């Protein structure tokens, strides 16, 4: 099924994290449209995933709420670390636009979290020097207005009403700060999925909804929306589902007399459909993933955590390929343990995570690790190498604290 085409979305090209739980000092560079995080249990994959969730929640619900629900500094700051928690994103708004760097440092006082530093920086032209067009500390700072801020432009001093307020979130609501507004839209538009089969069985209030929720508990609402607004797309999604669940005949969302919405699935041999609560976990998970990946108005960034759960191993190669297709319009961040999912991936798309002897996460691209490019060049698949121990980590039957072994010829291509 061909993916719909969209304008070039914003892309994160690099991410640096300091002092966030096990991520004491981790950098991801030259990120691809699809980035897959691989590693043993407890290596930090879900923590990287949560960094995106933390930033998105901080923008959409407020820093304090995101901070408090994760246990504040006591639980968030890396054990034995000092100083603020820091995040730094390097991204482009469109494919050929200048790189913009967004830096956020969060500290804590007895009254709660404070934004210790927050700035935006870019460089105009190939020979220009980087300069900050937004620079705030503890609620006070300067910003340059306009669509193309320049180092010579006038800086306007601003003061926010709280030291925990994010300047990008506040100023990004004003039309006179289009670059700041673009970042705010980008981050608040991220979609981080923690899909579970149980949640997809929910019986929600009737009413069409455009996008799948984090847990998938509005799957019936999205099916209703697609049926009403994108009937051809829904037909294609269900055709895909039938290829994986051959006896599946149709999927419906029917409104009950009390205003709730029932998700119904019908097997071909039978006359009557069954309620979603009686459908298999794998069928519901596959339907939810297809609905998310073929969203008619896709998010700029989508996260999927361990999509292999409840799915037959032979379905994972195709699912990985569909994720890559979807990455043409949504940057994808995926965590996995599955060798079957890995077999469809390129070594440049996969980052291997491991905890060192101090307990902190280290991360290298698969293409940076000793021996991996050579084995791939000889025809091996990443999943095979993962299962046979060529990454040096990840075997739960023989755990150790050996560090990952990067190549000596520098970083990945």
Locate the predicted segments by residue.
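Phosphate-binding P-loop
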Residues: 26-32, 294-297
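Conserved ABC ATPase signature
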Residues: 239-294, 301-317
């Amino acid at each position: 099924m061909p993916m719909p085409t969209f304008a070039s979305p914003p892309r994160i090209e690099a991410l640096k994290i300091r002092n966030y739980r096990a991520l004491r000092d981790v950098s991801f560079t030259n990120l691809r449209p699809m980035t897959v995080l691989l590693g043993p249990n407890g290596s930090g994959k879900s923590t990287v995933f949560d960094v995106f969730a933390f930033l998105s929640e901080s923008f959409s619900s407020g820093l304090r709420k995101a901070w408090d629900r994760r246990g504040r500094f006591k639980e968030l700051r890396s054990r034995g670390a000092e100083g603020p928690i820091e995040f730094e994103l390097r991204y482009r708004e469109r494919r050929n636009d200048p790189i913009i760097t967004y830096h956020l440092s969060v500290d804590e006082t007895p009254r709660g979290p404070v934004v210790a530093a927050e700035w935006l920086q870019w460089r105009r032209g190939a020979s220009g020097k980087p300069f900050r067009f937004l620079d705030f500390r503890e609620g006070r700072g300067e910003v340059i207005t306009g669509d193309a801020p320049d180092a010579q432009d006038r800086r306007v001093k601003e003061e926010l009403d709280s030291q925990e307020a994010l300047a990008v979130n506040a100023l990004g609501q004003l039309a006179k700060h289009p670059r700041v507004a673009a970042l705010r839209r980008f981050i608040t538009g991220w979609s981080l999925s923690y899909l579970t089969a149980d949640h997809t069985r929910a019986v929600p209030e009737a009413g069409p909804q455009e996008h799948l929720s984090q847990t998938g508990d509005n799957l019936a609402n999205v099916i209703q929306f697609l049926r009403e607004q994108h009937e051809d797309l829904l037909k294609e999604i269900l055709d895909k589902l039938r290829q994986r669940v051959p006896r599946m005949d149709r999927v419906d969302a029917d409104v009950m007399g009390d205003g709730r919405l029932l998700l119904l699935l019908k097997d071909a041999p039978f006359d009557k459909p069954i309620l979603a609560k009686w459908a298999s976990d794998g069928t519901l998970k596959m339907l939810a993933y297809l609905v998310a990946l073929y969203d008619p108005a896709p998010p700029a960034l989508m996260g999927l955590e361990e999509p292999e759960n409840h799915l037959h191993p032979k379905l994972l190669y195709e699912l990985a390929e569909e994720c890559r297709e979807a990455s043409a319009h949504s940057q994808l961040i995926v965590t996995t343990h599955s060798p079957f999912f890995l077999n469809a991936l390129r070594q440049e798309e996969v980052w291997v995570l491991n905890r060192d002897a101090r307990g902190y996460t280290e991360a290298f691209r698969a293409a940076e690790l000793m021996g991996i490019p050579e084995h791939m060049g000889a025809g091996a698949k990443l999943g095979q190498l993962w299962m046979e121990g060529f990454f040096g980590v990840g075997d739960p039957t023989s755990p150790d604290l050996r560090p990952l072994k990067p190549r000596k010829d520098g970083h990945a291509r």
